[in-house]
Design a protein with these regions (language model features):
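Phosphate/dinucleotide-binding and metal-coordinating scaffold of catalytic cores
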Residues: 1-228
């Protein structure tokens, strides 16, 4: 009889806990529970899509940096983002297929990866630790990445924030780029409330670790004015 009473108590406690958890999931905001999403600060600044932002990269030996871009080694620089200066940041060329494509096209308009916390872990851009600057050199529309990231966000997918930026280097015109939130610690904290967890990144589109992949099946190409 004693054992039966204990089982009844355990079942009752379990049922109550289940009910409380269900209420927390269904009525979390009403009960005062906060969602995992965290406001970081950079969302409403660099990733405000109502304007084209400005970024000026300041580096003494820019020509020397370009000569070693294929090595993807970080170099120290300063960034002036919408008039605000951030010193002691780190920058390198980024990409696999796109990196080799820049040389193949005969120019030096690389995509870049910026780490605000590379030399000092306490430094960020309003909470943002990593930033990608995509050259969009393989997209004649210069819109595919932007549209896909925005659609993913509208569908509730944890997608990187992005916005267009007018890039200059030591005051020299470097063209229109797409600034993309790095999928790193700040991205995890903004979307999941914590910067710790499992995070995976493929080496290349074809999964082969650097081989060239064809984009023929996904490219946007003008065919005709007649939609039929």
């Amino acid at each position: 009889m004693s054992t039966s009473k204990h089982i009844d108590v355990i079942c009752l406690v379990g049922a109550c806990l289940t009910l409380l958890l269900t209420m927390a999931f269904v009525c979390g905001e009403t009960l005062g529970l906060q969602a995992a999403d965290v406001e970081m600060g950079y969302e409403s600044r660099l990733f405000d899509t109502s304007q084209v932002h400005t970024i000026d990269i300041l580096m003494e030996d820019w020509d020397g940096f370009l000569e070693t871009c294929q090595d993807k080694e970080y170099a120290q620089c300063s960034l002036v983002i919408d008039g605000e200066t951030y010193g002691s940041a780190a920058i390198r060329a980024k990409g696999n297929n796109s990196l080799s494509s820049v040389s193949a096209y005969g120019n030096d308009r690389y995509s870049f990866k910026v780490e605000f916390d590379h030399y000092d872990s306490s430094k960020t851009y309003y909470g943002l630790d990593k930033l990608n600057l995509n050259n969009l050199i393989q997209d004649n529309t210069m819109m595919k990445d932007y549209l896909v990231y925005r659609m993913m966000g509208d569908f509730g997918v944890a997608a990187p924030l992005c916005s267009y930026v007018y890039l200059t280097v030591n005051g020299e015109d470097w063209g229109l780029y797409l600034a993309v939130e790095g999928v790193e610690e700040a991205f995890l904290r903004r979307n999941y409330g914590s910067s710790y967890g499992e995070l995976y990144k493929p080496d290349s589109m074809n999964g082969g670790g650097g081989g060239r992949a064809s984009n023929d099946d996904v490219k946007l190409q003008y065919l005709d004015d007649d939609p039929d």
